[in-house]
Amino acid sequence: MNRMSTIFLKIALVLIGIPILALCIFLVPKVANYSAELFPNIAYIKYLVFIYLYVTAIPFYFALYQAFKLLSYIDKNKAFSGLSVRALKNIKYCAVTISIFYAAGMPVFYLMAEIDDAPGIIVIGLVIIFASMVIAVFAAVLQKLLKEAIDIKSENDLTV
């Protein structure tokens, strides 16, 4: 892969991270306040939602960082190394973590949708869960293929 492709992908990673950062800055406080309005009898719900949404952003940004590292390994011609396998494994774990967090939060999504009569809230939660699982499965497949390619490469290096 030429350097221009990896530069494009690195820019794409940054452009993926910026809107999520904007959502964390501007939308998360509004969602937390909105949840406090929906559930006035639960005083701490605002802070739980606030912390919960920020905690789910941590594995997202860690996965972006790992993808950035993976592209750097490709630039350095270290794509077929244990470092790349480890980066893919970390991306897989981050995607699974995001799915678990949002699956655990689905009852709150359901309650918010029920009170507000907006089923789109549930759909948003499901899209996040399934997109994260697709990324996890894709990363797992790539991890396995890369590990097999590394094994084949090391076997070929030994036979020469």
From Swiss-Prot:
Keywords: Cell membrane, Membrane, Transmembrane, Transmembrane helix. It is found in: Cell membrane. Its main location: membrane. GO terms for cellular component: plasma membrane. Pfam families: DUF2975. Disulfide bonds: none annotated. The chain crosses the membrane at residues 7-27, 48-68, 95-115, 121-141. This is Uncharacterized membrane protein YoaS. The keyword Metal-binding does not apply. InterPro entries: DUF2975.
